[in-house]
Amino acid sequence: MHIRRLIILVGLATLAAPLARAAGLQCTTADKSTWLAPAAVQKMLQEHGFSNVGAIKADAGNCYVVQATDQTGAKKTLYLDPTDGDLMGME
């Protein structure tokens, strides 16, 4: 994922996050054997400027959920598609 795409996705996800959570965000229906390893997702987030990346956990909607600090120093909760690391929502 290119940084420009990530920035656009972060902006869109910020706007969509409350709606997504209210609607019961479903990130994937793919088998867990196809999911990225949490360590790979953590590395990807760090490469895109996030710091203080916390433990990566799966939620009921099959999203990876992680708390991290963004490039501006704000603490965020990120909802990621575990199959490819795409940002699905952010609070």
Language model regions located:
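Classic N-terminal secretory signal peptides
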Residues: 1-21
